[in-house]
Amino acid sequence: MLRPEATATAYREWDERWKTETGRRDWLKPESEVKEIAELLGNIGASAAMDLGCGIGRHSLFLASMGYSVFALDGSNAGVDFARSLAQEQMRPIHFVTGLMTDLPCADESFDYLLAWNVIYHGNRDVVRRSLSEIHRVLRPGGIFQGTMLSKNNHLFGHGREVAADTFVFEGELDKSHPHFYCNQTELAALFDPMELLRVNDLEHEHPGSYHLHFVAMKTHLQDLE
């Protein structure tokens, strides 16, 4: 079995992908669910947002266009560089940082809204828990966390090589050659404690069988995760 820190490595594959126009092509438009929640929160006073795993900046740019003060982080230098160039072209004052989801360079209780779309399942359970602990730390009380996790209904769950509990790699399958963690809705709720899950849907993405858990959660307690 791999050490936790050895499993959060998928950003290396994405770093290569973000260097090419072909690799960036499908990741330029913000998700409709993200737009929905960001607009709703903005209407009730949310102002500080973090785009965790920002990639090439599709959601960071949208959030900035909505008037949010945006802090955007990704492990990929290529992704951050491209996102920063787009923000400069569009004159969006976004603060971009290269870093890891398990060690967020932010003060406690900094954000009203934190987005991690297709991000925090890149690693084993310990990596997920560390990332959630950091997310909980930087959210303000009442802050909203929106994102996705890989569902155990996903057609890839249980295939490939299991490198840790519910964590699989698929040799030669681009970012799937890096560890991916899967869970069901009950396990998701346990991982998120003490955050409160407000919405969970098990939805297919672009390809048949590509189920992901789409969630919205709220920080309701002041204590850190265990």
Residue ranges and their predicted role:
Residues 129-141:
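A short glycine-rich, Lys/Arg-flanked "PGG" loop and its adjoining helix->strand segment in the class I
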Residues 102-114:
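A short acidic, Gly/Pro-enriched loop at the edge of an enzyme's catalytic core
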